[in-house]
Curated annotation (Swiss-Prot):
It is found in: Cytoplasm. This is Imidazolonepropionase. It catalyses: 4-imidazolone-5-propanoate + H2O = N-formimidoyl-L-glutamate. Belongs to the metallo-dependent hydrolases superfamily. HutI family.
Length: 421
């Protein structure tokens, strides 16, 4: 077979054999590091991988050849938890955070999510599209090729649908692949304050059926937290969403442990998000139910909290984990997955291999894209992040710098030395 593109002489390729399930426990610690590696691409797919000189049959007169001495290649990074589409920003809350005002106190004062809801409701489709596109561009420049994007800053049908429509438009227009999550249950809207059940009924009866019919989202999510939605309320919504055919995610155990993990395990959610306050018993429940733990260390960093999710304990117990940005305008205003990956080492005490497995193959399982992306594997799409680094450890050791040299998306050179092509 003659390749369309042949990438050669990488110092290292980060490869693994996808075992057919998210990596857990000792599997998280393993990878195949190919020295002097090459990747052959045809029709957007990886058709060969190896070490040394590629087979002569891969090279034809039209084959594009590129050498990457001094560079490493990983699968394209996957950010599987973002609140991508929103209006406004919340830097005016930063001084309050520095003064020690808590996230929930800011929310109670009408700030936080509700502040962004007001800004998003007043934002046009074009405003939201352009703002979200800029964030996606930034992510792409940092090696991200697939992104999960939630609604949740509308809390009414008109605005929630506008957010989902923006995600759908960007999925068509932008190189990054987007996976849509419907999260109208991100907070209790002011017009339903004191009556969250009535709001959930509106979501179930009026919103979810349309989202499903128009294929606007693949997943449904809810914020199960003190002063937001209870475990029973979360169970009520997610069970109805599951009946309609949605895959499930749940924000749980971020600030307090109030039963969100039980809901995730009972309903076989694909992932439970945050988990800073998770208990040993709850870790066992998620393992038993096969729920992926999606950890968001940049949120803990941004909130200036001391308690990070117990990633080391989770992995050692046999749990599958991922890492994501939680990109949003309030509790985590960043879109930099390289920073999150570095926090995975510095604050969660994971190894570079564990982090790379978390943000590639496990993240692919978290967004139901494991058949297409998540590993440098023959037959999968050629989503490749190329780092200006001599080895796999270097992008973690040399932190706070964008080390992306190039990005390939479906076999196309998409980012070249800081420019989107």
């Amino acid at each position: 077979m003659v390749a369309d593109v042949l990438l050669t002489h990488f110092n290292q390729l980060f490869c693994l054999n996808d075992p057919g399930h998210p990596l857990t426990g000792q599997e998280m610690k393993k990878a195949t590091i190919v020295e002097d590696g090459y990747i052959a691409i045809k029709d957007g797919l990886i058709v060969a991988l190896g070490s040394g000189e590629p087979d002569a049959e891969l090279v034809g007169p039209q084959t594009i050849m590129r050498s990457y001495k001094g560079k490493i290649a990983t699968p394209g990074i996957i950010d599987c938890h973002t609140h991508l589409v929103y209006g406004g920003s919340r830097e005016h809350e930063f001084a309050k955070k520095l003064a020690g005002v808590s996230y929930l106190d800011i929310l109670a004062q009408g700030g936080g999510i509700l502040s962004t809801v007001r800004a998003t409701r007043s934002a046009s489709f074009d405003n939201l599209y352009q703002k979200s596109k800029r964030l996606l561009d930034y992510m792409l420049l940092h090696g991200v090729t697939t992104v999960e994007a939630k609604s949740g800053y509308g809390l009414d049908w008109e605005t929630e649908k506008r957010q989902l429509d923006v995600v759908a438009a960007l999925e068509k227009d932008h190189p990054i692949d987007l996976v849509s999550t419907f999260m109208a249950a991100h907070a209790i809207p002011e017009e339903y304050k004191g009556n969250p059940k009535a709001y959930l009924d509106v979501i179930i009866k009026d919103m979810l059926p349309v989202v499903k019919e128009e294929n606007l989202a693949e997943f449904c999510d809810i914020f199960c937290e003190k002063n937001v939605f209870t475990a029973d309320e979360s169970r009520y919504l997610l069970s109805k969403a599951k009946e309609m055919g949605f895959k499930l995610r749940i924000h749980a155990d971020e600030i307090a442990s109030i039963g969100g993990v039980d809901v995730a395990a009972e309903l076989s959610a694909v992932s439970a998000e945050h988990l800073m306050m998770i208990t040993n018993d709850d870790i066992a429940k998620l393992i038993g139910a096969g729920v992926i733990g999606n950890l968001l260390p940049a949120t803990t960093f941004s909130l200036m909290e001391d308690t990070y999710a117990p990633a080391r304990k989770m992995i050692d117990a046999g749990m599958a984990i991922t890492l994501s940005t939680d990109s949003n305008p309030g509790s985590c205003p960043t879109a930099n997955m390289q920073f999150v990956m570095q926090l995975g080492c510095f604050m969660l005490r994971l190894t570079p291999i564990e982090v790379l497995n978390a943000v590639t193959i496990n993240a692919a399982y978290s967004v139901n894209r494991q058949e297409r992306v998540g590993s440098l594997t023959v037959g999968k799409e050629a989503d490749i992040a190329i780092f200006d680094a001599p080895n796999i450890d270097y992008p973690f050791y040399f932190f706070a710098t964008n080390l992306i040299h190039q990005v390939y998306k479906k076999g196309q050179l998409t980012v070249d030395r800081g420019r989107i092509l």
